[in-house]
Amino acid sequence: MAAGEGRRMRPLSERWPKPVLPIDGRPVIASLLRELVAGGFSEVTVVTGHLAEQVEELLGDGSAFGIAVRYARQPKPDGSADAVARALEVGVRPPLIVSAADTLYSAGDVGRFADAFAASGKPSALAYVPDGRPAPLWGLTEAVTAVLHELAGPPFELLEAVRRAGEVARVEIGKTRGVTGPLDLVRENFPYLR
C-alpha cells in the first residue's frame, strides 16, 4: 500500500510520497521489494494514490528490482481495507501479503512469515513484533516466526494487533558523518528526488 498522504512526514510528504523517501540511501519501497524478491515473490501489486506518478515512475514495471510490478489506484485515502479492495479489482487473488510500502523489515522476515503462513494451514495471519508497551486490552505476543493461530478474545484484540503491526521493523543505522556547517538535508540525503 503506497497511497497514503504521509501527514506526519510533512513537509517532505507534500512534495514526495513516503515510499520514495530514502532510508539508508535507498527509497524505502525499494527495500520492501528487495525483501519480497528474497522471500521468493515474483510479482507485487502496488496501490498508489497520493503523488502516485512518483511511485510508478520509480518502480516502473519492476524489472530493475527483479519483480513484476502492477498498479492499482486509490483515488482518495479511504484506508487499508479500501486499498486491498482496489488491488482485488485489478486481479490480485489470495493468498496475498498486505504491507505498507514504507515499512522496513529485517532481512528474511517477509520470507519467514510467508513460509510460516503456508505451513500453518490457516486462512489468514498477522505478523508483528510487540513493542513492550502494555496493550490497553488484550495483545498478541507471537514473534514473526511463531506458530500461527486464530485470535482469541473480543474483536478489538485485532485492532490492537493491527496497531502494533506497523511496528514490525527494526531499522539498522549505519555510519553517519559530522555536520559542521549549513546543509540542505533534502539535496544531501535524497539526491534522486527532484
Protein language model features and the residues they cover:
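A phosphate-binding catalytic loop at a beta-strand-loop-alpha-helix junction
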Residues: 1-12
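A generic "binding-loop/recognition-motif" signal
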Residues: 5, 16, 51, 175
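Conserved N-terminal catalytic core of the sugar/cofactor nucleotidyltransferase
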Residues: 8, 22, 26-110
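Conserved beta-strand segments of alpha/beta enzyme cores
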Residues: 19, 68-70, 167-169
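Conserved beta-strand termini and adjacent loop/short-helix elements that scaffold enzyme active sites
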Residues: 49, 72-74, 127-129, 171-173
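Conserved donor NDP-sugar-binding/catalytic core segment of glycosyltransferases
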Residues: 117-124
